[in-house]
Amino acid sequence: MLSWKKLVLAITLIGFTAQYAMSADIWVNDLRKMFTKNSSIIYEINLRTFGAQDINKDGIIDFEDGEESGTFLNAIPRLDELAAKRINTIHVLPITPVGKTKALGTAGSLYAASSFNTINPQLVSDKSALSAKSQAIKFVNEAHKRGIRVIIDLPSCGSYDLYMQRPELFVQDKSGQPVIPADWTDVRLLNAGTETDVNKDVYNLFKGFVDMVISIGADGIRADVATNKPAKFWKELIDYSRTKDPQFLWLAEASESWTEAVSPYAVFTPYNKLLEAGFDGYYGSFFNIKNYKTGKE
């Protein structure tokens, strides 16, 4: 007959075994913990090209010849390459639809978002019966099976198409025209508000993005040009995401060298305030690495 101590021990061991088995089948996000321990090995991918099927190797995707641009599904086989290199996190460039009006090039910039809560049809394979969202979920699940966490890029601005649909979301200049940030002519500056008055319409736009990426199983977000939103805006959004997933990682594109807004009409939030708002880290200005031999700081 088992003593009560042995019985408790047996039940405890069974409980631990069951918990381990469940963890083996259900992905548990641990990205913030990994990142803060400096254990994340992050690799950036552009899904639109990552798995592209250029059969004749001419550098051009000929759809008429059965070739296919990069999609969620044809990217999956290449995840094995990343796992073999011990990559444990991928930063996926934006998966939102690309604006067509005033687009740059034939495909348009991935950062010219025409919607923040739907998936870019360019990344969806028409060779599968799965829906766009189901294909995205499958990609994330396959990454997780290989021990790879997934960060999704959050565009900073809206496309001209989105401005035409919802002009109230955008900053306007003195003449009432939407503001072009920096020299990014295919996008317009979103009006996220100020530290004392967050624009709830833009907040809800971004909240919809958070809901979408969490619903496909992603583990974090990289915020493009995070400096042009108020810290209060980010804090509310980050806090919201962590009510759904406490381990949800937030990375800001920012830098100690960034000291000016992208437009006279834009907000500027320095990197230290972004960290106070809840970002786990920041990075930017990698183009300055080439100056390391001559730099003094």
Task: Describe each region flagged by the PLM.
Residues 8-16:
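Bacterial N-terminal signal peptides
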Residues 26-28, 140, 148, 208-211, ...:
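Active-site-proximal helices and loops of the catalytic beta/alpha 8
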Residues 162-218, 226-227:
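Active-site-adjacent "subsite" loops/lids of carbohydrate-active enzymes
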